[in-house]
């Protein structure tokens, strides 16, 4: 659990899919969110600070379908893989868990795999920036490589964003985005 918590600390805004053999497991709040959205069993593994640790998991061989559902629900997912095998672990002395690290982060706007994308629809990643009284808007479909940039007035932003229907919208933290 210590290794999981270290990895999770580096990716607090992502659901962490943590590889354990033939499964990806999720723990704590990530497990509660994933179990609810995916309709899978929420169980427990051990305890932390005297409380049960919520846990759920999905088979590695069928992970794409689960990832697609979480991405469509708007979640960011960090994939943590075993980066050494048991033989390598033995060569380094066999102490501690297998080495693991995040090898990929999936967000709704950066998915490129056909099996994770909605069929026959654009998957736009949209970014906003301000230049005096104008707004710069850039959009890219990562699966096709299409990329466009346009400058618009404030009053055109809502219409433009609605037309693009982005999978993900990125904007500066100090940007005052309207409540549409």
Locations of the language-model features?
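Basic, polar low-complexity surface loops/patches
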Residues: 1-180
């Amino acid at each position: 659990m210590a290794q999981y918590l270290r990895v999770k600390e580096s990716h607090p805004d992502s659901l962490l899919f943590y590889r354990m053999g033939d499964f990806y497991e999720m723990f704590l709040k990530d497990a509660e969110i994933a179990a609810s959205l995916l309709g899978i069993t929420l169980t427990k593994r051990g305890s932390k600070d005297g409380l049960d640790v919520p846990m759920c998991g999905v088979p590695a061989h069928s992970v794409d379908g689960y990832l697609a559902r979480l991405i469509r629900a708007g979640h960011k997912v960090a994939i943590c893989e075993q980066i050494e095998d048991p033989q390598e672990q033995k060569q380094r002395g066999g102490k501690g868990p297998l080495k693991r690290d995040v090898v990929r982060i999936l967000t709704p706007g950066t998915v490129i795999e056909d099996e994770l994308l909605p069929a026959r629809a654009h998957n736009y990643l949209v970014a906003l920036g301000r230049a005096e009284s104008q707004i710069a808007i850039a959009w890219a479909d990562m699966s096709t490589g299409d990329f466009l940039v346009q400058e618009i007035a404030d009053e055109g932003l809502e219409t433009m964003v609605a037309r693009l229907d982005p999978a993900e919208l990125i904007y500066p933290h100090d940007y005052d985005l309207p409540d549409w």
